């Protein structure tokens, strides 16, 4: 399930980065880019957790919701004194790790990001394939 979630988001991000040129170089009709909203603030955003074996470097924020921080495994999380986020040596500074189980306002931040991710996915999935 984690693989499917990450694959879906990866497909979404790939679709967003597509610049509207076909394989043979002809220009396609410009379609507005998919608005990621606050989901675009995350390098990894998941509803089901994320795991690493320690051979990972994430350049940006990691977030999970509605599942708790315990679903982020292998990152050796270090909780910030505010309890709003944690850090990891595997998440490049200034990247942070966010989870719905952390102190307010983090749960609200994560709910909004997940909602924005789902809205962006629905938008991208509903578009006509240019090929």
How would you name each of these model-derived features?
Residues 4-20:
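Cleavable N-terminal signal peptides of Sec/SRP-targeted secreted and luminal proteins
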């Amino acid at each position: 399930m984690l693989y499917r979630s990450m694959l879906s988001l990866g497909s979404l991000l790939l679709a967003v980065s597509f610049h509207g040129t076909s394989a043979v170089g002809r220009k396609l009709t410009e379609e507005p880019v998919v608005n990621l909203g606050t989901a675009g603030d995350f390098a990894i955003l998941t509803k089901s957790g994320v795991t690493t074996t320690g051979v990972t470097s994430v350049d940006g924020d990691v977030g999970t919701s509605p599942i708790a921080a315990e679903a982020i495994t292998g990152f050796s999380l270090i909780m910030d004194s505010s309890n709003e986020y944690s850090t990891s040596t595997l998440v490049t500074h200034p990247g942070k790790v966010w989870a719905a189980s952390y102190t307010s306002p983090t749960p609200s931040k994560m709910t909004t990001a997940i909602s924005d991710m789902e809205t962006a996915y629905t938008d991208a999935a509903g578009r006509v394939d240019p090929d």
